[in-house]
Design a protein with these regions (language model features):
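C-terminal/domain-terminus segments
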Residues: 251-277
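N-terminal pre-domain/capping segments
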Residues: 1-101, 135, 162, 191, ...
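Residues at the N-termini of beta-strands
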Residues: 31, 103, 195, 251-252
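A short, acidic, amphipathic alpha-helical segment used as a generic capping/interface helix at domain edges
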Residues: 232-246
Length: 280
């Protein structure tokens, strides 16, 4: 099996940025993904000088940015709000380039399985504009998997006719929310995968993605799933990673841990688990 580089989400460490970078280097990962939507690491607050300083600090620890997270928590489902969200996303793409990565990941909302759904066209128009911009600067705006099945997402992407909008494959989201097979998703989305999350989880019953991803108003969202440490959920990581190898993916497996009382230990355990599968 290919020896995939391993990354970690800066925010998963739950400490300040520089401490997280230092800890990631100590754990022995090679890459970092960082949220850059609000706060000190947003485009408006990270000046050119600060971007240079941050990149130098990352490099001084032997690391690179695998991707930037540009999830604005709203998707691109509202025609009135989309122009502002698209412009903010373009600035995050610019920031990512300054940090020497060409991947920005995000959630775009739930892609309807029915192409005649009003939301489908709204999302497609937004993604078409983002794909053109990403193409123009040699980058990818990568949709995170989970809200819909991989087959529905593939059909949506095929219609864009561009790799500017691509895929950040999160196998746990697929397994937890829709119950989609992460291994088959690799093959369905093979032409678009530019980044992946190493996350695990289990689904315990039916879920409504429209409620979970707040596409419809809901005061009592039922989540019949749970994020789990790597190897303890329903993601078949050996088969999943073998599939990534099979399609020729050579990018990062970036550890994302959104729950748990000891995130540093969980990230370290996850890195060891992935290395064990790869025989490192």
């Amino acid at each position: 099996m290919y020896k995939f580089p391993i990354g970690a989400m800066v925010d998963s460490f739950r400490m300040d940025t520089k401490s997280a970078i230092k800890k990631a280097a100590e754990i022995g990962v090679q890459g970092l993904q960082m949220y850059s939507t609000t706060g000190e690491n947003s485009p408006e607050n990270l000046t050119v000088e600060k971007r240079r300083e941050l990149l130098d600090y990352v490099k001084s620890h032997g690391l690179v940015f695998s991707a930037i997270c540009g999830d604005l928590n709203m998707g691109f489902v509202n025609r009135e709000l989309n122009p502002e969200l698209i412009e903010k996303s373009k600035r995050i793409l610019d920031l990512a380039k300054d940090l020497e990565t060409n991947v920005v990941t995000t959630h775009i909302g739930v892609v309807p399985s029915n192409k005649n759904h009003e939301r489908y066209k709204i999302m497609q128009e937004a993604c078409f504009e983002l794909s053109r911009y990403a193409d123009s600067i040699g980058s990818h705006f990568a949709i995170e998997t989970g809200p819909e099945t991989s087959a529905v997402l593939k059909e949506f992407l095929d219609a864009l006719g561009s790799k500017g909008v691509a895929v950040n494959l999160d196998p746990a989201n697929l397994a937890m929310v829709t119950g989609d097979d992460p291994v088959q998703a690799v093959y369905n989305l093979k032409d678009y995968i530019v980044h992946t999350h190493a996350k695990d989880g289990s689904k315990f019953g039916d879920n409504n993605p429209e409620e979970i991803y707040r596409m419809v108003p809901c005061d009592n969202i039922i989540r019949n799933y749970k994020e789990m440490p790597l190897g303890e959920g329903q993601v078949p990581f050996k088969e999943y990673m073998a599939a990534l190898d099979d399609i020729g993916y050579r990018g990062f497996l970036t550890i994302e841990r959104e729950v748990g009382d000891n995130p540093v230990a969980d990230i370290e355990t996850a890195a060891k688990y992935l290395k064990g599968i790869m025989g490192i």
